[in-house]
From Swiss-Prot:
Belongs to the PsaF family. It holds the Pfam family PSI_PsaF. The gene is PSAF. It is found in: Plastid, Chloroplast thylakoid lumen. Keywords: Chloroplast, Photosynthesis, Photosystem I, Plastid, Thylakoid, Transit peptide. This is Photosystem I reaction center subunit III, chloroplastic. SUPFAM superfamilies: Subunit III of photosystem I reaction centre, PsaF. Disulfide bonds: none annotated. Its main location: plastid. The lineage of its organism: Eukaryota, Viridiplantae, Streptophyta, Embryophyta, Tracheophyta.
Length: 232
């Protein structure tokens, strides 16, 4: 896109031989054309935009390099602030020694082959096994030497809280679903209260095994509108 603007300029006066001749002026009118091209402006704007974008990307790259060079890399084991792996914790090892020492002092009070002595020995073996498992499973201990459960959702620590939590919810839902099914099954009996006091074992056993699939059954009843009693 282009357009032309015509303008005229008045030339300055020509003064020659001021002393001997009068001032003569000549005005020369000249025509000048100014051509403005829209495509040229667009090219200039695009070039300016590209150059500014390059400058911005270069600044971001430089800032990321500076930040990465100034922030120290954290050790792989110290993934949670203030916690260390239990197998490397001195306080954790100290607690294990103290627990075993107390059991050994109690063991001296009984005869070697007596029942209390055998029970204490079994407890000592369980204590050793428990501390070994804490170290092998990668649990993290604090400054007190006690294992800390990580509940932030980190996949590396799912076995500490997420998995047991889901298992707990499943078992609790299973028990509740079986109890609900039992109450629904006996509500049409002549004496339903009597069967609540004295459990019908064959019926309860049958419902107990059906309850393993309670999430699917609950979802099916929810879709059918049978999960919630509308009269309540």
């Amino acid at each position: 896109m282009s357009f032309t603007i015509s303008t005229s300029f008045l030339q300055p006066l020509e003064i020659s031989n001021l002393k001997s001749s009068p001032i003569t002026s000549k005005s020369k009118v000249t025509s000048t054309s100014i051509v403005c091209s829209g495509s040229t402006d667009e090219k200039i704007n695009n070039a300016d935009g590209k150059s500014s974008l390059k400058a911005l990307s270069a600044a971001l790259a430089l800032s990321s390099i500076l930040v990465s060079s100034t922030v120290p890399a954290l050790p792989a084991s110290a993934d949670i602030s203030g916690l260390t792996p239990c197998k490397e914790s001195k306080q954790f090892a100290k607690r294990e020694k103290q627990s075993l020492k107390k059991l050994e002092s109690s063991l001296k009070l009984y005869a070697p082959d007596s029942a209390p002595a055998l029970a204490i020995k079994a407890t000592m073996e369980k204590t050793k096994r428990r501390f070994d498992n804490y170290g092998k499973q990668g649990l993290l201990c604090g400054s007190d030497g006690l294992p800390h459960l990580i509940v932030s959702g980190d996949q590396r620590h799912w076995g500490e809280f997420i998995t047991p939590g889901i298992l707990f919810l499943y078992i609790a839902g299973w028990i509740g679903w079986v109890g609900r099914s039992y109450l629904i099954a006996i509500r049409d009996e002549k004496k339903p209260t009597q069967k609540e006091i004295i459990i019908d074992v064959p019926l309860a056993t049958k419902l107990l095994f059906r309850g393993f699939s309670w999430p699917v059954a609950a979802y099916r009843e929810y879709l059918n509108g049978e999960l919630i009693d509308p009269t309540v």
